[in-house]
Regions:
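Local sequence-structure signature of Cys/Sec-based thiol-disulfide redox active-site neighborhoods
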Residues: 1-25
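Short active-site oxyanion
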Residues: 3-5, 28-30, 61-62
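Glycine-/small-residue-rich active-site loops that bind phosphorylated ligands and cofactors
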Residues: 13, 36, 64
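Short, charge-rich, low-complexity interaction segments located
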Residues: 42-46
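Structural micro-motif
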Residues: 48-57
Length: 78
């Protein structure tokens, strides 16, 4: 089973799309709202050249920034 963490914001449509996509696939994940967690926001900036790209998704240690559904599916499948 893939370990998935989604770093995003509640108001962000791309974040919400990714959450719905994973729900449809039945993939469990941890969602971290970077607007309420400065340490997580810092982690996102470190992995995105100083930008808070939402969503930034970590799948089994691999970091994806604003991935397409296909990119996310491929990362989950390994």
């Amino acid at each position: 089973m893939s370990k998935v963490k989604i770093y995003g914001a509640d108001w962000c449509e791309d974040t919400q799309h990714a959450l719905r996509h994973l729900d449809r696939l039945g993939v469990s994940y941890d969602y971290i709202n970077i607007e309420q967690n400065e340490e997580a926001a810092r982690w996102v900036r470190e992995h995105n050249d100083g930008k808070e790209r939402k969503p930034t998704i970590e799948v089994n240690g691999r970091v994806l920034s604003v991935p397409s559904d296909e990119e996310l599916d491929a990362a989950i499948k390994g």
